[in-house]
Amino acid sequence: MGLLSIGTPLSWDESKKYNNHVRTNGITQLINIFKQHGYRENDVFLWGDEVEYMLVDFDETKKTARLSIDKDYIINDLNDPDKLLPIAEKQDVSYHPEYGRFMVEATPAKPYNGNLLSDYLYIEKNMIIRRQLCEDNLPSHIKLLTLTTFPRMGCNIFTSPPSKPDGIASQSLFLPDEIINRHARFPTLTANIRKRKGHKVAINLPIYPDKSTKLLDDTIPQNRELFDSDKEPWIGASKPGFIYMDSMGFGMGSSCLQITMQTKNISQARYLYDSLAPIAPIMLSLSAAAPIFKGFLVDQDVRWNVVSGAVDDRTFIEKGQEPYSGYHLFGGLDIDAQDKLRINNHQINQQGDLLDLYTKDGKPIQRVPQSRYDSIDNYLNDNYYDTKYFQDEYNDLNAPINEQVYQRLIDEGKLDKYMANHFAHLFIRDPLVIFSERINQDNNLENDHFENIQSTNWQTLRFKPPALYTKDTDLTTKPGWRVEFRPMEIQLTDFENAAYSSFITLLSKAILKFQPNFYIPLSKVEINMKLAHKVDSTLKDKFWFRSFELWNIDPQEFDDYGFEWFDQFINGNQQQNGHVNNNNNNDKKTKNDPIIVNGSTTTTNGTNSGSGITETNGTMLPKGCEGKTVEEINDVDDNGIDQRYTICQLINGSGEFPGFIKLVIKLIATDLVPQALNNSTISKEQLIEN
């Protein structure tokens, strides 16, 4: 999670003096990155996944399961050359710290080759090894669970050993600071978000309505006076009918599944980034796995808005809200005291933007519509790629920018206006953690100032430039232009996580091969993000997506690539070019026949019926894709460019139009399988067995 520098992190009061220094030098570093890597070509399609685990202490005698906060030494052991690192390297796995002291992040030690079918077949095995190696070197009662959220986080005793919520960093009423990673960055990050904001984060989730449910969060302490902030839930931070959470740990203590893919060049990365933007809320809904927070069943199924609220450092004025009684409108922003009268009489223009208000370093104080952790605000524009589908009207969100940064990127960096706008939007933020030893850097060789801002903008997608290297470095051996896909929730089993990881990567590779047009206005993507939070949204709701007939692909070219292709391939009825020989009279499964997956029978099909998706980890309610719409979405005449589809339709297709699955299967049939058979010693029988 972000940069883990060795050194002394500055408190907010100290670090805010260097905010402009970090932004200015970060942009210099970014300009140098573009100079070094802007014309880079022909990088291999490499990719990797990040799985986040929770260490859970099971007491069979007392029948309890609690988050383990004293076994974090395991990460050091797994990275110690004298202990477990040689074993981890030999097993091709790598381990990293996360926000929670009870958390472990694990990745493959080397990226997968996205052009090799064998690497896709290896993913689950690698994930199994990651879990086992870590678990085998912990006490037997400590288990690694891939839970999106720990259901009882914030309840009375939920940690092992027990710890009290009285920490100075978070000042939480519910979470002890002992859940936070011991590295100095993390408690400083927690405290600095609160100090910049001027009050604690306030996360309110709707309680799931039931006849026996009290629509009141009665877990909020009424008489605690340990910190001044203890009164906040009673002066406006909490809402009736909602669960109240007040700490970064409720969000950043969640686990997710993230995928990073390297493209051949920057233009391809821009097209992939834009193409995945409308898919992000679809995959958030499909992977939903978080129906319980702080011991309450909530009226939503995912973690996203919880994490968004948990790292929301915006002040009252940046959010356009009235402050709590006795609280400052500008929170912890660095402003001149003598400006108080003018500040209290600030004006806004017709768009709601603030006029003539600045911090001491000259940065305008702006309205900021979204948290640092949210969906993307701008497409990057594919007009420099082969496709050229983008139109300006697709970027229809209010996304304020840092004008000085924008102008520098245009004038000095020679970036086009869309790329400059992307980074200028990220750089409206302040750095949250600055290490005193890292204030001065070599902008030709280091990029920590850039990453300080870049890595603390946690969006559904992250456009990842390469790092800076010396002139004699062979850049082909270093990571290139990458896209990180970030919305998915972690799943309970390695099989599920491997399936989601391989699916989104195969879909991305299929997008690059077949070049569909998925652009819709980002305002529709934002509606989809809200829809994805709803209970059973995968089963019950329709999502905005580009009309099937406008994907710019020939549907007939995908006719032979439903799930039946696998049956034909396995039974020897496939022609050399990957097409299915439909004239063969051998026994065949129909589209609606069950397919055996991982030892269990799962119904999958190529139609838009409800049997293709049964349930997510966030639901156990009745099955079926009824395609119900929600009240907040009205029919809009947009000339048929965008339509509302069930997730079944988007995944499996509808009528003559292919969905995501057929794109993936055709990629496997015409690209990965022929390459595997032609370029290796493996036989078709061995490939089928694998």
UniProtKB/Swiss-Prot annotation:
Similarity section: Belongs to the glutamate--cysteine ligase type 3 family.
Gene Ontology BP terms: glutathione biosynthetic process; response to cadmium ion; response to hydrogen peroxide
One GO molecular-function entry: glutamate-cysteine ligase activity
Name under which the protein is recorded: Glutamate--cysteine ligase
Segments for region (Disordered): 574-620
Biased composition (Low complexity): 574-585, 598-619
RNA-binding keyword on record: no
Pfam families documented for this protein: GCS (PF03074)
Single GO cellular component term: cytoplasm
Alphabetical keyword list: ATP-binding, Glutathione biosynthesis, Ligase, Nucleotide-binding
Enzyme Commission identifier(s): 6.3.2.2
Superkingdom assignment: Eukaryota
Annotated metabolic or biological route of this protein: Sulfur metabolism; glutathione biosynthesis; glutathione from L-cysteine and L-glutamate: step 1/2
Known catalytic reactions: L-cysteine + L-glutamate + ATP = gamma-L-glutamyl-L-cysteine + ADP + phosphate + H(+)
Species name: Candida albicans
PANTHER family: GLUTAMATE CYSTEINE LIGASE, GLUTAMATE--CYSTEINE LIGASE CATALYTIC SUBUNIT
